[in-house]
Amino acid sequence: MAEAGQARFERIQVAPAYQLVAEAIEREVIAGRLLPGEPVGTEAELVRQFGVNRSTVREGIRLLEQSGLIRRDSSRRLFAAVPHYDRFAGGISRAFVLNEITFRELWESTLAIETAVAELAAERITDAILAELEDNMRKSEKAMKKPSELALLDIEFHDILARASGNRVLQFAREPENKLFFPTTEMLFRRNAHAAERNKAAHTAIIEALRAHDKAQAVLWMRRHINDWKRGFELIGKSIDQAIDRTYAED
């Protein structure tokens, strides 16, 4: 029991208003309602929408610029952006970078995990998740010439597939590499003229295999898909034996 005069509860820590502004905008970007390259609004518009003062908005924007979720153009207008890998990466992902994990190691582990995901998904996928994958394909069709947006949709495709596996350990296991894979896919779509079409072909074949509950074809196409990234890197002059940090830094 609390003694007389002794506080039973700790004070509630209320987040500063600028942090709430930053979190509100961040949620829109992460949810895909605000896509990379789309205008966020002027400072004056954000002041009016959030009902806070200009300094609060500016501080919130500063946080988002530091995290890479907002950028300014030459006229100082604000746009949603895609963070670089080190801003995506947390926990284990950051340890990968600090320990100079190579892209070869990332590719090998991704190959093992994603083929296991594909095999289980072929057995367990539902009509609802198939519909999500098909919707992802429709959005990807519209983003074929937009490397950053297409790379985000590629991540979404594999996230949906992981849920289809019904195995939460695999879902968690793939998260660190998933965070680090975004810059690689964006780089390929930007620098390899055939990468987007090859990605589309692989995703289409994987969906067809899942619809037929064909484990062998799902695994085969996933293996081809992941191996294709390795070949793509070599074609644009990247070494998969370089550390992840160096691979991105030299892009």
List PLM regions with ranges.
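Short linear motifs at protein or domain termini
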Residues: M1-I113, E119, S239-A243, T247-D251
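Luminal/periplasmic acceptor-recognition loop/helix of membrane-associated glycosyltransferases
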Residues: R191
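Conserved amphipathic alpha-helical segments that form helical-bundle/coiled-coil interaction surfaces
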Residues: T110-M187, N199-E208, Q217-G232
